[in-house]
Amino acid sequence: MLPAKYSPKDVESEIFKFWEDNDIYRKVKEKGGRKFYFVDGPPYTTGRIHLGTAWNKVLKDTILRYKRMMGFAPTDTPGWDMHGLPIEVKVEQELGFRTKRDIESFGIDKFIERCMNYALANKDAMTEQFKSLAVWMDWENPYMTIKAEYMNAAWFAIKRAHERGLLERKKMVVNWCHRCETALADAEVEYWDEEDPSIYVKFPVKGEKDTYIVIWTTTPWTLPANMAVAVHPSLEYAKFRAVKDGKVEYLILAKELADSVLGKGDYDSWEVVETYLGEDLEGLEYEHPLADEVPLQKNWKHQVFFADFVTAENTGCVHIAPGHGVEDYELGVEKGLEVFNPVDDRGVYTEEAGKYAGKHVKEANDDIIDDLYRKDLLLAEERIVHRYGHCWRCKTPIIYRATEQWFIKISELKDEMLEEIDKVMWIPEWAGSARFKDWVSNAKDWCISRQRYWGIPIPVWICEKCGEMKVVGSINEIEWENDLDLHRPKIDAVTFSCQCGGVMRRVPDVFDVWFDSGVASWGSIAYPLRKDKFEELWPADFITEGHDQTRGWFYSQLGTSVVCFDKAPYKAVLMHGFTLDEQGRKMSKSLGNVVEPEEVVGQIGVDGFRLYVLYSAPWEDLRFSWEEARNINRMLNVVWNAVRFAHTYMSLDNYSFGEKGELKIEDRWILSRLESFIKEANEAMEGYQVHRVVRAFFDFFVEDFSRWYIQIIRPRVWEERDSPSKLAAYYTMFRVIDRSLRAIAPFAPLIAEWFYQHVVKEFREGEESIFMEEYSTAEVEMIDGELEAAMKVAKEIVEAAANARNKAKRKLRWPLRELVIESGSEKVRKAVEMLEETILSQCNVKQVRVVDSFEKEIEIKPNYKYIGPLLKEKAGEFAKYVASLKEIPEKLVFDGVELDPKQAIVVDYRLPEGYEYAEFSGGVVYIYKELDDELVREAFAREVIRRIQEMRKELDLDVEEFIETTVEMDAELVKGWEDYIKSETRSQKLVFGKAEGYVREWNIEGKKVKIGIKRLRG
């Protein structure tokens, strides 16, 4: 007999040991099968896994297990992203470093070694965490971005870009982290609200006394680098005569924004002097507001240009600093402006910044504002809270600065990338057609260089003498004296001789870490060093990651793949959501709302955790709820009890699967539902919609099998051993359990394996593991849609009858004389005809009949809570209208307002004496609640039976054990039902007299009843 309660811990420890002792994973893999190329999106080895990474790997494992059971041999190489700022920043924190100079003082070689060790240690720890979630991957042979064969794949990609003219070194404005002292990709910038200065500045117009162009900025520190002002060509601008404290100024800004702006400047009055379009302002010269503080600015001419990116916001006049803004830079290049960037890698002003040299840009804001105020050029000053970008790893606010960087010309590949997106299967569809396409459509050239240490070195060597460039595309192009290590600083020592006689040295940059993972589809199989697997497998059949990867891994893979092969590197992509707290907030230590995977597993087990995260539609964010998680565990307990029930009786009777008996209608129904569930699972998994399978499983196994079918067939398992009816029930239950387990095994592998070993293989021969079995595929010929529809109606009738019983205060154990179903539906009539026996037994009534109309009076009243807000003063008229109705109309429109009839109208039935009612979708059920003497005796017998069965449980009696029962009560109360009591309680003797043995006193319907039971040995 199976344990009475489901213990996830016991099940899991046993199965983990079984898998390990018997090398099950290897044996499953050895079965082989059709090719299925899966590429694992590599997580950063920065610490412990969190709820999101756990969900991600469970999702992948589920699909891989499914594919294996479907006859595929999927690649299951786990990946690890082990380079980049994610690792560097963690190691810097461990070492107490604050700047790059700390790293160089420590020694680049030693820092690289620490990064390597940190990444490897975390990889090992995270591997154990993933394994504890029953994730089957080839953990002994992962792909790691730190391996030479993988780094070679990135070198191959950059060489292809160079050969195609897509690799370019140029000066561009990029996101810059001044703490990490490196460029960042757009995908590496995280945004949140931050408070900054908000200032309105007057730029003096050249040659016009007391005349100014008014600009607005939240980055005063960029003003030393100002080179121009931009206006929109078709926006209306005006020169205002403004008066403050008797002094007159002339201010140029967008006409429609003047009241707001000049109001902030505390002007007493203002009036329009002149209006013009933005294009009329082009060429207007002004004096730099900080020319005295930044003397270099006196060397350049400053003027107004028009630009389409200017909007009618703030002042309509935009301060342009080509060295500190992307659009500014583009306009500067177009107009031939100086790209002035007097800020170094640390975010500190250089000597070119004049007065501000040596100050950090953010710290200089106040000094600049003070200087503007002193020169009477500060029109207004405020504080603003706005979304601002921060470094994704160290969380420092970024700055924008123009620097020399290496770029892939994505702008030249964009059309091809968009075409490739259309060839991919996206789940959900809009992940590709909307979200990803939008991102790619707006993508700029990809800055692939980083000014850091721990990464794949960019394989570009440049001659110190003539500037000749060499791009290395393979590690085979380098002669190595010692162990092959492509990392800095060893690679920096490699030089080449140039034809000019000079020495070629490697550029100091490393790759953007997204370039690392971008080559995963071929780097993970060591292409181009080894070509066999690539030719057999590439491109990937399937990948899945979170929705942030539309700008991350999905994008970097597509870009590198189109560069190298003019083709998308994946055929199908499932985009999943993020894990949030119950309020929809991101989990963070600062909010104190972090839930660790181990915490969840500790409460509901590994399978409970897996089923919980897989229950939600994967592309939706998962709002973690402890109550919902525990509900999954409750449902697993229902599954356990259902399997235990079946196993108990089949085991007692030494059942062997194959003996079919005579299937009854409820057997045919549940077998039909089984195949419908499996059909749903098959279709869902082909579309990678895992949540549909989990939901369908619980709906079928918990609701249909456990809470309905088993309740119907309970009396049949007490029949004689060779009863055809009992054999049919056994056949049906076993088939349901066997096929359901194979359908849910990829999702809940531990409990499925446990049941397979302890239940399935007891009644039929099987494989060594459930994962060597084939996944269940639907036998559609067994699906009876008409029967399923009829049973759905029957269940509704039974539920409605239970509601009517509640109203009548009649327990289900108390039999009733009659159930009347009022319905004009042929579907209902046919269902009752087909399933009369089921309805009678589950409603516990003696007879059931269907009528078109039941004798009653109907009172129809308005539901004022619903109609009040909709009809207001017309509610009284509606009440009069409703009073005239004889029945509820299908459609209801009153005074031009469409109402829901079921909500707008309340129906009250006045029934014949002794009846109670309840509604269901197909009509109304009526029960006759009055009890005659015969029904009372039967009801009392059922109450006695329930108490005896409870006492059997308390004595922990086996199901088949016989007892002797003594009852102290008036025997007349159960007269005629003695044999029924004996049969239902396995009592060989039933004596009315002094209670003996194990005795308990009960209160049954106000009567004291003493019951004694004795175990009969023999």
Curated annotation (Swiss-Prot):
PROSITE patterns: AA_TRNA_LIGASE_I
Positions of ATP binding: 589
GO molecular function, one term: aminoacyl-tRNA deacylase activity
InterPro entries: aa-tRNA-synth_I_CS, aa-tRNA-synth_Ia, Anticodon_Ile_ABEc, Ile-tRNA-ligase, Ile-tRNA-ligase_type2, M/V/L/I-tRNA-synth_anticd-bd, Rossmann-like_a/b/a_fold, tRNAsynth_Ia_anticodon-bd
Single Gene Ontology BP annotation: isoleucyl-tRNA aminoacylation
Role, per record: Catalyzes the attachment of isoleucine to tRNA(Ile). As IleRS can inadvertently accommodate and process structurally similar amino acids such as valine, to avoid such errors it has two additional distinct tRNA(Ile)-dependent editing activities. One activity is designated as 'pretransfer' editing and involves the hydrolysis of activated Val-AMP. The other activity is designated 'posttransfer' editing and involves deacylation of mischarged Val-tRNA(Ile).
Protein name stated in the entry: Isoleucine--tRNA ligase
